[in-house]
Amino acid sequence: VPLAFLGRHAAGNAAVAVELSLALCRKDFDITDEAILEGLAAVENRSSIRVVSQRPLVILDACRTPQQAAALLRVLNMAKVRHMSAIIGLTEEEGAEAFFSALETGLTPEEQKKDKSTMPGMSENPFDKVYLVTPQGTDTALTERLTEKAKYHFDAELCATLAEAVRLAHANTRRG
């Protein structure tokens, strides 16, 4: 059954739903295999990771915490995705260093404390380049500071507009 979602957590939730359905069947509830499969197929993707298009590959992810960034990187690495550009628009400086580090290494701040072997800029990563944009209602000076922080982890560039970032990301892609 093709699932409407990506990621380990969503797949785990699907497995729990199947097991719960089977447990109810053992308690004499009438749930057919077809009903379980139809239910899985009908699930709407409410996760932050969304594939917008396949060619070129465009993924929209609303991640903004180190934990969400690490989860996104795990999904991309599991799918063996490489040579992507990321467009990032953060509204706060607090936690930005941990966010960029997690997006680079796949490790949350807690995991990074345990694993000292990962140095910034040395990890295999799906992102060839990241473009930073200023979200509406956010100060451009903040995005300038965030771009400097991002440069410790990625080839990072500040863009004046989202349209400019999309144009540059598309021009930079090495994917079909």
Predicted regions and their residues:
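Nucleotide phosphate-binding/pyrophosphate-handling subdomain across enzymes
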Residues: 1-129
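C-terminal helical cap/extension that packs against the catalytic core
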Residues: 57-58, 98-175
